[in-house]
A protein has these predicted regions:
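N-terminal auxiliary segments of SAM/dcSAM-dependent transferases
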Residues: 1-44
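Conserved alpha-helix/loop element of class I SAM-dependent methyltransferases that forms part
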Residues: 65-83
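Conserved class I S-adenosyl-L-methionine
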Residues: 81-92, 108
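Conserved SAM-binding loop of SAM-dependent methyltransferases across substrates and taxa
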Residues: 93-105
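S-adenosyl-L-methionine
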Residues: 110-150
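A short glycine-rich, Lys/Arg-flanked "PGG" loop and its adjoining helix->strand segment in the class I
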Residues: 171-185
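Conserved beta-strand signature within the Rossmann-like core of class I S-adenosyl-L-methionine
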Residues: 186-194
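Class I S-adenosyl-L-methionine
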Residues: 196-233
């Protein structure tokens, strides 16, 4: 077991497959893991915590030095500017929301799972998600929440959902219509789709691109490195 960091009076240690916290002198090591219909845990990749659900990694780390490099590249490619409003549909550990906020943007981010938010609150690298006045963190189902949002209120949408088999509704054309509706004119979208199915000849990026196009999105471009699709309203 190795020491990762000290943060706010707590000590964080890690092994190859688990992150632990020690809350004070004489305290026992506590696994940062819990079960809520699925098994959620934090582990470490290149000195940065990542989230796993049922053994599936939720951060894209392939071709990136650390889990923080992927959100940096997404935000940089979107060209997020000071004062813009950003919707982050699936919070996770909040790394994308935090990176977008660094640009001076106002962020609304939504997470379905209370378990994920509980682990994020234990994660020192997620602390800014809950402490920044420029990030509104909501625990809700974005598929329902978005229906109550006003038209044309976001400059940028970052849609980084779980894989298709876990949340097919977040890849549906009806949901894409809601994304289109709440996005301002000429607003930008990034939609992570992953690489599942490619070995069988299926391309979720191509399928999603066609649905986005039929919804009205333009300038649709697949990005293999980020395993997603960029588009504009």
């Amino acid at each position: 077991m190795k020491l990762l960091t000290h943060y706010k009076g707590k000590e964080y240690y890690y092994t190859d497959n688990m992150l632990y916290v020690k809350t004070g002198d004489g305290a026992q090591f506590q696994k940062l893991a819990l079960f809520d219909r699925h098994f959620y845990k934090l582990r470490v990749f290149n000195k940065i915590p990542i989230l796993e659900i049922d053994g599936l990694r939720m951060q894209l780390v392939r071709d990136f030095k650390t889990p923080l490099d992927y959100p940096k590249e997404v935000v940089r490619t979107l060209g997020i500017k000071k004062g813009e409003s950003v919707l982050d549909t699936c919070t996770g550990l909040g790394y994308i929301a935090i990176e977008a906020e660094k640009c001076g943007a106002k962020i609304t981010t939504c997470e379905l799972s209370p378990a994920v938010l509980t682990l994020a609150k234990w994660n020192p690298w997620s602390d800014h998600l809950f402490s920044s006045p420029n990030i509104e963190s909501l625990q809700s189902d974005i598929a329902h929440l978005i229906k109550g949002m006003k038209d044309k209120i976001f400059d940028v949408i970052i849609h980084d959902p779980p894989r298709f088999s876990h949340a097919p509704d977040l890849y549906s054309q009806s949901f894409y219509r809601e994304l289109f509706r709440v996005l301002k004119g000429r607003g930008r979208l990034f939609h992570y789709v992953g690489s599942v199915g490619e070995s069988r000849g299926r391309s979720l990026a191509s399928e999603s691109s066609r649905r986005l196009a039929s919804t009205g999105f333009k300038d649709i471009k697949e990005n293999k490195r980020l395993q997603g699709v960029f588009a504009r309203k």
